[in-house]
Amino acid sequence: MDNFKPCYALKKLAFLCNNMKSTNGVERVLSQRLSLLAESGMYEVYLITYNQYGAPFSFPISDKVHYIDLATRYIERCSYHGLFQYLDRLISKITYKKALCRCLSKINPDVISCVDIHLADLTTVIDYPTNATKVVECHCGLSAYYADLEKIRNPYKKNKERKIKEMIIHTISRFDRIVVLTEDEKSEWDLGDKVVSIPNMLIYYPENLPDRTTLHHRVISVGRYAYQKGYDLLIDVWKLINKRHPDWSLHIYGSHDGDMGDCNQLKRMIADSQMKNVFLHEATNEVYAKYNESDFYVMSSRYESFGLVLIEAMSCGLPIVSFDCKYGPRSIIVDGETGILAPPSDVKKLAESISYMIEHTDERMSMGRNAYTSVAKYKPERIMSIWQQFYQSL
């Protein structure tokens, strides 16, 4: 069976994303999914990036995945501002679209999947003349697309961003299939059978429950240093925790995605509070080791589409304390059994929940055991069978 070769043409799957040099959850699960699809022998898998520029992948990808980098730096150049940059942005957009269309024409895929939600990607794929099924993967809930507008103070910029987001949502709705991460997101789109819910999968699931008897006095959180993740709220929470439990520490591991603004704000908040037990770390590929050095996980996000970090932490036997934000936490955490859910953005309630978790050791251990068992359903073999059924149906 190992030498079996199908006598039919393999279905060609083309995946389009910005780059694979980030250490974020999207890149982590995508690298695994593409590798497993290619290794299955059922598909010819193509990964197309446009901003990799020779940088190494953050996560390993099978050699059986065909890789193409368009090397246009389109997204980076679109962030330039000023009168003289307008022409450069226009030229880069045209160059990018031509390069992508040439690439797709050469591959002639059966399925084209947009992984990143950039307007240029979406419009280029939608306008590209082909019989291929066009798929968009939404890693952010529908209403959450507007959440980032809250931090924009300039009315002109806010209105401009709102219009762009409206265009993105309209373009997404034109795709043949929309893949979301939770059933709540699926119902919010209200587009019938064209919307499919497929959750993220675990990269790794320990065969045995990790030993959680050693007390570390450490709480962990993992994610980008960005407004979405609510780390500013978490630092305010920790000011309250520090008064009751100064022997406990908070460790945040995150990437910057080229923007240090949010991280610098957090550093100022920590310095102003004079807390010595809050630590901001760079993102790490050894995140499971960090989970195992911690007692429980806290999520302070303003919104989440799923929360890959939640199931990762739970697979290590960590219970969760989280805001009950849209959309992910409630679809994963059973309140009182595998963790504690606090009202969205309620600093006081989240602090109370963290204190409860600290002060009730036996209950924390029990929740951790329940958490480990509950996320077995996200093992790769189960989630990949759902993906394969999806691709075979197209």
Which role does the model predict for each range below?
Residues L16-T23, L36, S40-L87, E188, ...:
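N-terminal strand-loop element at the rim of the active site
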Residues N24-Q32, H217, A226-L240, K348:
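A conserved mid-protein helix/loop that constitutes part of the nucleotide-sugar donor-binding site
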Residues C114-A120, C138:
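Short His-centered aromatic/hydrophobic patch
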Residues P319-F323:
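Short hydrophobic beta-strand element within catalytic cores of glycosyltransferases
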Residues V334-G336, I340-V347, Y356-D362, A376:
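Conserved acidic donor-binding segment of nucleotide-sugar-dependent glycosyltransferases
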